[in-house]
């Protein structure tokens, strides 16, 4: 896509933002009046003619004004949508300042705010790579059975039944649980199996059937695997949008529920950020996808909506503030 000079960028930005706000075309006189531009309408008309010839604007069928083309929206989204959206920024900063809210609830509320402000359906993908063991306890429920309660740093609670036997006696399980409480708390869930091998010698000093017990814990209790989870917010934004055909809607609902939008967009990274992809290929749909650093709890955020209705500056504002918040939280935890 050719890079425009600063003069053309200024007026294209105003025309696109006016259309996002009003949904209407704009002529040179209205552009001058709306933005207090000191140039004459004829000067602005000449600039708009140039932008039309270059494929960034087109004439509206219902008036003499012009509206952005898909290329105009793509250019705006990639190069001109960096102004902070003050309304969303203030809401997010207020949310992030509430120390009483746990991190998971904060993230959930933040992405809801972003989705509503941008005017899109938003998909937030997380996984358990960074989850840690926060507690492990045994509750006996009968003479021969117990429940091992495992709590992770995300607040996830798993209840796993254990049957006591000659090879796995109740007293040995209690000893093992006590050792795990001393040595495994705050260990990443996906590293627990490897740490159990280190604890084997310590267990052998205290219990008779350490091999059988360790094998049971590795197979039945600490059998954690990488799991991706996608939460969808503001789905009605897609479902109720009259500009999206029913056939396209079916395709989009399948995509947001079954696929990684980041991977689907292939090489659509923006010039300024190789972790951000923006794709505007039809009036019906625009995709925005952000890949987060591995150590952060969110792996990917993607937004889907009608190309000409999305508030692109709000999208950038929300993504940046959320990324900054999560990065700061991660540094505090590591420190």
From Swiss-Prot:
HAMAP family associated with the record: HrcA
InterPro entries from the UniProt entry: HrcA (IPR002571), HrcA_C (IPR021153), WH-like_DNA-bd_sf (IPR036388), WH_DNA-bd_sf (IPR036390)
GO molecular function: DNA binding
Repressor keyword on record: yes
Protein name as it appears in the record: Heat-inducible transcription repressor HrcA
Superkingdom assignment: Bacteria
Gene Ontology biological process terms from the UniProt entry: negative regulation of DNA-templated transcription
């Amino acid at each position: 896509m050719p890079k425009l000079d600063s003069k053309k960028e200024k007026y294209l930005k105003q025309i696109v933002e006016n259309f996002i706000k009003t949904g209407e075309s704009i002529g040179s006189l209205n552009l001058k009046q709306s933005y207090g531009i000191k140039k004459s309408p004829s000067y602005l008309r000449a600039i708009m003619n140039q932008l039309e010839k270059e494929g960034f604007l087109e004439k509206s069928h219902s008036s003499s004004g012009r509206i952005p083309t898909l290329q105009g929206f793509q250019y705006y989204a990639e190069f001109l949508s960096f102004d902070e959206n003050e309304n969303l920024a203030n809401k997010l900063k207020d949310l992030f300042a509430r120390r009483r809210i746990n991190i998971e609830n904060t993230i959930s509320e933040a992405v809801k705010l972003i989705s509503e402000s941008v005017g899109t359906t938003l998909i937030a993908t997380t996984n358990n790579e960074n989850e840690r063991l926060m507690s492990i306890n045994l509750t006996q429920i009968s003479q021969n059975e117990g429940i091992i309660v495992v709590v992770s740093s995300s607040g996830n609670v798993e209840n796993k039944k254990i049957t006591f036997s000659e090879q796995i006696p109740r007293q040995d399980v209690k000893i093992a649980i006590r050792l795990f409480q001393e040595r495994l708390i705050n260990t990443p869930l996906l590293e627990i199996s490897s740490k159990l091998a280190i604890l084997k010698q310590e267990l052998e000093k205290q219990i008779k059937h350490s091999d059988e017990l360790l094998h049971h814990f590795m197979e039945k209790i600490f059998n954690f695997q990488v799991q991706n989870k996608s939460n969808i917010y503001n789905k009605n934004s897609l479902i109720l949008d009259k500009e999206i055909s029913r056939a396209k809607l079916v395709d989009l609902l399948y995509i947001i529920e079954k696929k990684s939008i980041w991977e689907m967009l292939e090489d659509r990274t923006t010039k300024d950020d190789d972790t951000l992809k923006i794709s505007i290929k039809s009036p019906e749909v625009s995709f925005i996808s952000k890949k987060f650093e591995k150590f952060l709890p969110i792996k990917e955020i993607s937004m889907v909506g009608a190309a000409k209705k999305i508030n692109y500056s709000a999208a950038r504002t929300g993504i940046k503030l959320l990324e900054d918040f999560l990065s700061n939280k991660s540094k505090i935890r590591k420190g």
